[in-house]
C-alpha cells in the first residue's frame, strides 16, 4: 500500500518522481503522469501493477515508470496473467463488494493479499494466457482509436453541413 508524500512536495511540473495517487493517474490501463513529487515514500518499479485501493477500489494499470505510490494505490508484483486476473476481478465487481458498506469505498492490504486468484502453476501457461489477453487488449485499443477517428470525421462533416 502506498504512503503519501508531504503535500508541499507536489508539483504539476515534471520533477524527481512521478506520484500515483489513484484512478485519475491511470488511463487505458497505464500510469499517466500528472503530478510529481520530490519526496520518495513507497515505490513501484517499471512493469509493476498499480491498483487503486480507494474510491474507486480495484482499478488497475501497469507502469512504464518508476513511481512513488500515494495512499490511494498499491503496487503489485506480477506478470501479465496477474494483471489480467485483477482486471477481470474489477470488471466482475469483486473489489466493490469487499468495499461495500463502508462510508469511503476502500480495500486494505489483507483484502488484496487474500484475494482468491485461480493461477496456473505453470509459468509458461500463465505467460501464454497473459500474452493472448494482451494481444486482444491491443486490438481493442486499435479499434477504439479507429472508432474515435470516424466519430470525429462524422462530427466535422455534420458541422460543415449545417453551418
Which residues does each PLM region occupy?
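Feature detects amphipathic, helix-rich regulatory segments
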Residues: 1-163
Amino acid at each position: 500500500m502506498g504512503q503519501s508524500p508531504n503535500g508541499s512536495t507536489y508539483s504539476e511540473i515534471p520533477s524527481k518522481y512521478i506520484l500515483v495517487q489513484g484512478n485519475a493517474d491511470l488511463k487505458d490501463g497505464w500510469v499517466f503522469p500528472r503530478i510529481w513529487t520530490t519526496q520518495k515514500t513507497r515505490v513501484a518499479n517499471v512493469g509493476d501493477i498499480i491498483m487503486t485501493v480507494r474510491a474507486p477500489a480495484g482499478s488497475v494499470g501497469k507502469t512504464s515508470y518508476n513511481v512513488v505510490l500515494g495512499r490511494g494505490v498499491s503496487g503489485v508484483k506480477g506478470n501479465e496473467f496477474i494483471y489480467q486476473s485483477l482486471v477481470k476481478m474489477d470488471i466482475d465487481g469483486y473489489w466493490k463488494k469487499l468495499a461495500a458498506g463502508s462510508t469511503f469505498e476502500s480495500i486494505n492490504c489483507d483484502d488484496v493479499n487474500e484475494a482468491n486468484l485461480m493461477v496456473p502453476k505453470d509459468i509458461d501457461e500463465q505467460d501464454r494466457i497473459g500474452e493472448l489477453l494482451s494481444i486482444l487488449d491491443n486490438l481493442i485499443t486499435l479499434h477504439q482509436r479507429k472508432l474515435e477517428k470516424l466519430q470525429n470525421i462524422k462530427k466535422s462533416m455534420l458541422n460543415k453541413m449545417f453551418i
